[in-house]
């Protein structure tokens, strides 16, 4: 038999929904939107890394940051 601990008693409410599934699609469309946004973010980072996204109009200078 499992031993009851104080930490287990604190975490038990987080597991109270175990086995219950929301009917329908639930939050799947929201997850899809965030996955798409994350993919676009990674694509932009990859293009900057490969220099295929030209950023010549942005001048980066440490003095412009006021440091």
Swiss-Prot record:
InterPro entries: PSII_PsbH, PSII_PsbH_sf
One Pfam family recorded for the sequence: PsbH
Superkingdom, taxonomy of origin: Bacteria
UniProt keyword annotations, A-Z: Membrane, Photosynthesis, Photosystem II, Thylakoid, Transmembrane, Transmembrane helix
Gene Ontology BP, a term: protein stabilization
Transmembrane segments: 29-49
Membrane topology listed for this record: Single-pass membrane protein
Cellular component, GO annotation: photosystem II; plasma membrane-derived thylakoid membrane
Location within or outside the cell: Cellular thylakoid membrane
Coiled-coil intervals: none
Gene Ontology MF: a single term: phosphate ion binding
Family indicated by similarity: Belongs to the PsbH family.
Assembly, per entry: PSII is composed of 1 copy each of membrane proteins PsbA, PsbB, PsbC, PsbD, PsbE, PsbF, PsbH, PsbI, PsbJ, PsbK, PsbL, PsbM, PsbT, PsbX, PsbY, PsbZ, Psb30/Ycf12, peripheral proteins PsbO, CyanoQ (PsbQ), PsbU, PsbV and a large number of cofactors. It forms dimeric complexes.
Function: One of the components of the core complex of photosystem II (PSII), required for its stability and/or assembly. PSII is a light-driven water:plastoquinone oxidoreductase that uses light energy to abstract electrons from H(2)O, generating O(2) and a proton gradient subsequently used for ATP formation. It consists of a core antenna complex that captures photons, and an electron transfer chain that converts photonic excitation into a charge separation.
Name recorded for this polypeptide: Photosystem II reaction center protein H
Organism expressing this protein natively: Synechococcus elongatus (strain ATCC 33912 / PCC 7942 / FACHB-805)
